[in-house]
Amino acid sequence: MKYNLVVAGGGLSGVAAAVSAAREGLTVLLVEKSGCLGGAISNNLVYPFMPYWTKQKDGSDICKKYLSQGIFKEMKVRHDRYVDDCKDHEFNSEYLKIVLDDMTAEAGVDVLFHAVVYDVKTDNRKISSVEITAKAQKITIEADFFIDATGDGDLFYLAGCDYQLGRESDSLCQPMTTCFRMSGVDLDLFTEERPRLQELYKEKQAKGEITNPRENILVFFGVGEDVLHFNSTRVVMLDPTNPFDVSKAEVIARKQIHELIGFLKENSAAFNESALISVAVNIGVRESRKLKGVHILSGDELINCTRFEDSIALGNYDIDIHSPTGTGTSHRYFGDGEYYTIPYRSLLPKEYDNLLVAGRCISATHEAQASVRIMPICCCLGEAAGTAVSIAHNTNKNVHTVDTKALQKKLTENGAML
């Protein structure tokens, strides 16, 4: 079997990569390990969208400038037809699954679920084929181009590309987190009691009665009139690319969930009628392998709001680093009107001419990745990668010789904000 493009990973970056390339006439196979598209949204219960806009003055008014547009905007608009009064950061993951199915089908993308790439074949500076396993079958797929949108950089790792695991000083990664939701919560009472609960949480943590090292109880509203979304578990000092470590982390996080629910029910009447209604299928990974590509995006470049000539996406989410060793979360925020650009070169492996990387595993330092890892930005990176492959294919170029001005022109024509 042969395609023009194989995309590994069906999260937002992989979907955007596949759809953007297929819309330009390429034959595309999208390989996804689970049974649905959406990645962190579908399998890790990640919610909500972190801010993908900046605020700027328009005359005397303050208005939003949306930085993540293109396919991301299309996806959000299509989703919002199903959900009344949906705010910019909100979504219903179940409807998003349907939207992503529709978008890939309409573009003509072949989607292979329950499948993972486990080996690659290379020829000089090209990947010639990938070996996929699905339902106990081994499948060889040849392609002209490949995009790694796996999050963990599995494809570029198998191909032998240079990479950095976690932070540069000790290879420790940001913590893993399993999100969960509770219904039947008195949200008004919880909001009133939240400061007291937070202090009590810290007291019990200091006594060792709470084992979760996270410094606070992080929750989000907006998923239901009596539902709380928790992003509160924290598993540290384990390797997200080691299957035995990840298996350990899954159990630790579920234990933390049980512990936290007990604490809330015991100490707040807001949870008297509450019930656990959902736990993420898989633990969420903030950081793992990051490509060491043609350009390694740095934290300083983000802080300085660098404008790269080969910019293919924008961002201004804060540099949000959850301590890899335990308690604490650091933030470096951007001011109104401030944003940075992400260069095409950060999607380029040094080793191959027909491989691009999209999503949270692009070429970036620990600090820079802490900002670019959010889903709206990842979606834009995927669209840029898929569009670049379509240009390379249609002009007989490789990914390193793509005309970045032509790439930028095509992206803006398709609604991207550069």
Residue ranges and their predicted role:
Residues K121-T140:
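Conserved beta-strand-loop-beta-strand element in the redox core of flavoprotein oxidoreductases
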Residues V6-A8, A17, A22, R125:
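Membrane-embedded transmembrane-helix bundle of lipid-linked glycan/lipid transferases
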